[in-house]
Amino acid sequence: MVGTRDGGGAAMLTLIEKMTENYIAIKVARKTAKAVETAMQGLREECGDMVAQVFKTITVDNGSEFVTFASLSEWETKVYYVHPYSSWARPQNERSNGMYRRYAPKGHSMDSLSDEDVAHAADLICGLPRKKLGHHTPEELFDACLDEIYTA
């Protein structure tokens, strides 16, 4: 997700865990493959050896920033690419990005946001109960899922 129309400056890498709808937003310096790869390596370090259990699949669009995702085979995570101009193929992510735009409107530079600002906005989104989730929050369900994974 980019801030300004020209795509320059900082951008946001966003991920959705499909079962719990947990939203993860990571600020990247630029919308480049290298910046996204660095963010994903940080996420891998955070998850440790259980990364394949936390992220069973990842679906990305065909943007040039995702060309290195094929190298995620070391994660034992399947990577799927959607067809160009098919945002409907990732509805949860698109809806959550729309919610994120309340905190960082289109055209607003992401450069001014700190990592803490980005994480705080994602936490607010994950803290909203969802009817689809039995009025639980994505955060509650994701935490329970992580507890299950890391205690097994």
Give the label of every model feature segment.
Residues 1-20:
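An active-site-proximal beta-strand-loop segment
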Residues 21-26, 81, 106:
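Short small-residue beta-strand/loop micro-motif enriched in glycine and branched aliphatics
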Residues 55-57:
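Short active-site oxyanion
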Residues 106-152:
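C-terminal domain-tail junction helix/linker
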